[in-house]
From Swiss-Prot:
Binding site residues for ATP: G105, Q106, T107, G108, T109, G110, K111, T112
Modified residues (Phosphoserine): S1046
Protein name listed in UniProt: Kinesin-like protein KIF11
GO annotation, cellular component aspect: centrosome; cytoplasm; spindle microtubule; spindle pole
């Protein structure tokens, strides 16, 4: 039981795993920049947060923050999204999981670009280097790379499904009919899966075929241009990748592992008002929004754990049923826009993605199939389809009652379940042994690796200690050099302070001088420039004004004189023109009167001609009607009589057909005899089939015996392998061997039962074959009787056709009589038409006569009207001439008044120009600036500053001095320690101090270097030289107390840190 539980746990890992949700924000596009839209989205990739400003620009409180599994900002690249989202999923697909990745978001936010991308101009890019490639081409490229590196046999098949207006279409179908709709059915092997009938799966052999497949699908996919996106996807697409991989177990058995990856590119949700969709585009948008709303309801129901999930309300949710709450690992990429004009859609997308995080899936690894089982399954399926096809073609087969068929199917299903159960148990045990062996090998390998790493680390530690010793020596030398450099730096710092003080004083004086010069220069330049520019501009302006005023006055005077002369001339010319106009009008009316009289007489002549032509047309029409009647009679004789003859010929032809029917009946009788012989031969073949099936079942019995022997052999080999391979796990293996023994015994018992069931099946097959022979004989007798009935019916049909022919002859005679009647009726019609035409012609002649009288009366009216019009025009022209003379006289008076007014304006303008010149002179004389002394100009003086700089000694000299000081210090320390140890020390003076044990071997190289680094600031002398001087002074004094010696020992002890490493000196 423990092995079975471990197998089930390894098969169903990652129970209750949440859907992974990723948010990607695209950059601003040109449409959003033209609309002056600002950003309302802040993406924090390290913290995996997205912040949305729902208020105004200055509203700091109106923010909403969402947390997701991953967040990609506008600067994120295609490869970053792929490596973070799809690479881990791809490894799980190769392990045998079903995985789904789909992109959701508003239209125009980059879903298709994320899933498919674009193809770069240089086709030599790999999937990692191509900057524009999307998830689909990168996925297939990496699948081929990974599987090729593993060295396993594999096959990759892809399919591309489109959901457009709630209809399914295959974008990779080889048929030219793009509009062929597909049907969807529930998968009986997977309760949450579906099967698409007729969906084409294309085999992909290398990564170079990926772009060709995508181009085929993109060429058929429905796209259109809207106001929000130039290439808006109008449908959902599902790109499925199925991988079959072959594995070889320890026993040499070949297994087939299946992994599936669904890459879904959803159509974007859109606002019809903003996208400008109408008619067909509006219906598409409605269907898209409807399917996305259903998807949202499904997600809400899954999060709230509702009892009913509305998967079947949309074909999109029905296809994604296993990806939402099923056994598939799912990732959602939500694409959003950062622009403020898309704030509502962005918030809706983020809310949708935030709800989808809480969906729980239960991923399961697809069951591995053995190669033999898979081939056997395919072979049985092919044979079954062949038998069904042959039966359908020949309309032949084995027929059973429903009870026997259901009983047989129940037995087969129960036996298949028993065999499947024991096969799974054996597979679980084999996998458990394989896992234990792999674990042992991995632990052994890890132990060897750890041993190797430990040896390497020990070598590295020795090298590090050696490098540490050298580094400490170099550090001590550098510290001594730095001390000397600090001393020199302090001296240089004092010199620099003095120089900076002098520089500040000189800079202050120079600034004062420059300020003085700038003030002088500014005043001079300002006055000169203002004076010159203002004087020049004002002189030019006043000269131009004065000249223009003079010219304007002269011109106005000339214009007034010209107006006066022109008006006088206009009055004379107008009077003459009016007189001429009156005379011309009178002449024109006279000519009009003559013309009208002439035209009326001409019209009378035309009417007379029309009467003559009408009479002639009447005669011609009567002749035409007579010719029509003659032609119609001739057509009836020449055309219809042959038709009647043809009908009679058809009657004779039908008689010949009846004779043919009689011959067919004779042939059917011969066919009946042939069928008798066929059914006899068929009965013999069924008998042979029964004998062949008996021999086949006997061979199955022998194969079962051999299989039984092989199972017993495998059992003995398994026991020996378990005893020899693992000794440390003896107790567990004993339990495993007992369980295996019990399972094998049960398997042998079931095999015995299977043998009995095969015997029963053989007996059933014999009985079924006998029934089939009897059934075939009964069908033979039935078919012979039916053939005889058919022959009798054909003879009866021939007799009925003879009656039909006689009736058709009678109808032909009736047709001849009706044709003669039609001829008489057409003659009568021609006579009546001739009478109607005569009456119409007479009416036309009467109408022309009345028109003649009307034109004569019109001529008289025109003559009277023209005379009256001439009188009126003459009176009107005279009145017009008097009005113009009066208006021109008043105009001359007005022009004289304007001339006097212009003279007055000229005098006023001269006065204004004179006053302007006076103002300019006062400005130039009174308003110019002068330079005023400020008293801040510096006086001349001398500056004192240092002229020499201190320089540090060379590095070689400093290092030599350091070595000498170190040597002297070590000698002084040795002497001090020796003097402190030689004389006896009183116990009372050392009670308060800890015991000191000094040994050269206990000192570390660090302590030595630290002693050599401590120096005083006065001249760079180290403190150990001062101790040496104290030691010499102590030696010269004879009465040195024990307290002073103890103080020296304390100083030495404090300056020497304790260490367990030996002291190494290299001078």
């Amino acid at each position: 039981m423990s092995s079975q539980n471990s197998f089930m746990s390894s098969k169903k890992d990652d129970k209750g795993k949440n859907i992974q949700v990723v948010v990607r924000c695209r950059p601003f596009n040109q449409l959003e920049r033209k609309a002056s839209s600002h950003s309302v989205l802040e993406c924090d990739a390290p913290r995996k947060e997205v912040c949305v400003r729902t208020g105004g620009i200055n509203d700091k409180l109106g923010k909403k923050t969402y947390t997701f599994d991953m967040v990609f900002g506008p600067a994120a690249k295609q490869i970053d999204v792929y490596r973070s989202v799809v690479c881990p999923i791809l490894d799980e697909v190769i392990m045998g999981y079903n995985c789904t990745v789909f992109a959701y978001g508003q239209t125009g936010t980059g879903k298709t670009f994320t899933m498919e991308g674009e193809r770069s101009a240089d086709e030599e890019f790999t999937w990692e280097q191509d900057p524009l490639a999307g998830i689909i081409p990168r996925t297939l490229h990496q699948i081929f790379e990974k599987l090729s590196e593993n060295g396993t046999e594999f096959s990759v098949k892809v399919s591309l499904l489109e959901i457009y207006n709630e209809e399914l279409f295959d974008l990779l179908s080889p048929s030219p009919d793009v509009g062929e709709r597909l049907q969807m059915f529930d998968d009986p092997r997977n309760k949450r899966g579906v099967i698409i009938k007729g969906l084409e799966e294309v085999s992909v052999h290398n990564k170079d075929e990926v772009y060709h497949i995508l181009e085929r699908g993109a060429a058929r996919r429905k796209t259109a241009s809207t106001l929000m996106n130039a290439y808006s996807s109008r449908s959902h697409s599902v790109f499925s990748v199925t991988i079959h991989m072959k594995e070889t177990t320890v026993d040499g058995e070949e297994l087939v592992k299946i992994g599936k990856l669904n890459l879904v590119d959803l159509a974007g949700s859109e606002n019809i008002g903003r996208s400008g969709a109408v008619d067909k585009r509006a219906r598409e948008a409605g269907n898209i929004n409807q399917s996305l709303l259903t998807l949202g309801r499904v997600i809400t129901a899954l999060v709230e754990r509702a009892p009913h999930i509305p998967y079947r309300e949309s074909k999109l949710t029905r296809i994604l049923q296993d990806s939402l709450g099923g056994r598939t690992k799912t990732s959602i990429i939500a694409t959003v826009s950062p622009a403020s004009i898309n704030l509502e859609e962005t918030v809706s997308t983020l809310e949708y993605a935030n709800r989808a995080k809480n969906i729980m899936n239960k991923p399961e690894v697809n069951q591995k199939l053995t190669k033999r089982a898979l081939i056997k399954e395919y072979t049985e399926e092919i044979e079954r389809l062949k038998r069904d096809l042959a039966t359908a073609r020949e309309k032949n087969g084995v027929y059973l009652s429903n009870e026997n068929y259901e009983q047989l199917q129940g037995k087969v299903l129960s036996q298949e379940e028993i065999i499947t159960e024991y096969t799974e148990k054996i597979t679980a045990m084999e996998e458990e042994i394989k896992r234990i062996n792999e674990l042992f090998a991995e632990n052994k390998k890890e132990l060897e690796e750890c041993t190797t790493i430990l040896q390497c680390k020990e070598k590295e530690l020795e090298e590090t200690q050696k490098n540490l010793h050298e580094s400490k020596e170099q550090l001590a030398q550098e510290a001594f050099v730095v001390t000397a450099l600090e001393t020199t730096e302090k001296k240089l710092h004092g010199t620099a302070n003095k120089l900076l003080t002098t520089v500040r004083e000189t800079s202050k004086d120079v600034s004062g001088l420059h300020a003085k010069l700038d003030r002088k220069r500014a005043v001079d330049q300002h006055n000169t420039q203002v004076h010159e520019n203002f004087a020049e501009q004002m002189d030019k302006r006043f000269s131009v004004i004065e000249r223009s005023v003079d010219e304007y006055s002269v011109k106005q005077q000339g214009m007034l004189d010209f107006y006066t002369n022109s008006i006088d001339n206009l009055l004379g010319a107008s009077s003459a023109a009016l007189s001429v106009t009156a005379t011309a009008v009178a002449k024109s009316f006279t000519s009009v009167q003559e013309t009208v009289s002439e035209k009326v007489s001409h019209s009378v002549d035309e009417i007379l001609k029309q009467e003559t032509l009408s009479s002639q047309a009447k005669d011609d029409l009567q002749k035409l009607m007579a010719a029509h009647r003659t032609g119609l009679e001739q057509a009836l004789r020449t055309d219809l009589l042959p038709v009647v003859t043809a009908v009679l010929n058809l009657n004779s032809h039908l008689s010949h057909c009846l004779q043919n029917f009689q011959a067919v009946a004779d042939k059917i009788d011969s066919h009946k005899e042939e069928m008798n012989s066929f059914f006899t031969e068929h009965s013999r073949s069924l008998h042979r089939l029964r004998l062949d099936s008996g021999s086949a079942l006997s061979s199955i019995q022998s194969e079962y015996e051999s299989l039984k022997v092989e199972i017993e052999t495998a059992q003995s080999m398994h026991s020996e392998g378990v005893n020899n391979l693992i000794g440390s796990l003896q107790n567990q293996l004993n339990l495993l061997a007992m369980e295996t023994q019990q399972n094998f015994s049960g398997f042998l018992a079931k095999g015995g039962k299977l043998q009995k069931s095969v015997g029963c099946l053989q007996q059933d097959l014999d009985s079924i074959s006998s029934d089939a022979i009897e059934h075939t004989s009964s069908h033979h007798d039935k078919f012979a009787g039916q053939s005889q009935d058919i022959a009798v019916e054909i003879r009866q049909l021939a007799a009925s056709n003879m009656g039909t022919l006689e009736e058709s002859s009678k109808q032909c005679e009736k047709l001849t009589g009706s044709i003669n009647a039609i001829s008489r009726e057409s003659q009568h019609w021609c006579e009546s038409a001739s009478q109607q035409i005569d009456s119409l012609l007479e009416e036309q002649v009467c109408y022309l006569r009345t028109s003649k009288k009307h034109l004569q009366s019109l001529q008289k009216d025109v003559e009277v009207g023209c005379g009256a019009s001439v009188v009126e025009i003459t009176e009107h022209v005279n009145a017009q001439r008097q009005a113009e003379e009066k208006a021109l006289t008043s105009l001359v008076e007005q022009v004289r008044d304007d001339k006097e007014m212009l003279g007055e304006q000229r005098l006023e303008l001269h006065e204004q120009v004179q006053s302007g010149q006076n103002k300019v002179n006062s400005y130039l004389n009174e308003e110019l600036r002068n330079d005023v002394p400020t008293g801040t100009t510096p006086q001349r003086r001398d500056y004192v500053y240092p002229s020499l700089l201190v320089r540090t000694k060379p590095r070689d000299v400093l290092l030599e001095q350091f070595r000498q000081q170190q040597q002297e210090y070590l000698e002084s320390i040795s002497s001090v320690i020796s003097e402190a140890v030689e004389p006896p020390v009183e116990q009372d003076s050392l009670e308060d101090e800890p015991p000191v044990a000094v040994n050269d071997s206990v000192m570390s190289e660090k302590s030595c270097i630290d002693l050599s680094m401590v120096c005083q600031e006065n001249g760079g002398v180290p403190f150990f030289q001062q101790k040496k001087a104290l030691r010499k002074e102590k030696e010269n004094r004879a009465n040195t107390t024990l307290l002073e010696r103890s103080k020296i020992m304390d100083e030495a002890e404090q300056s020497l840190p304790k260490s367990k490493l030996p002291l190494r000196m290299q001078n």
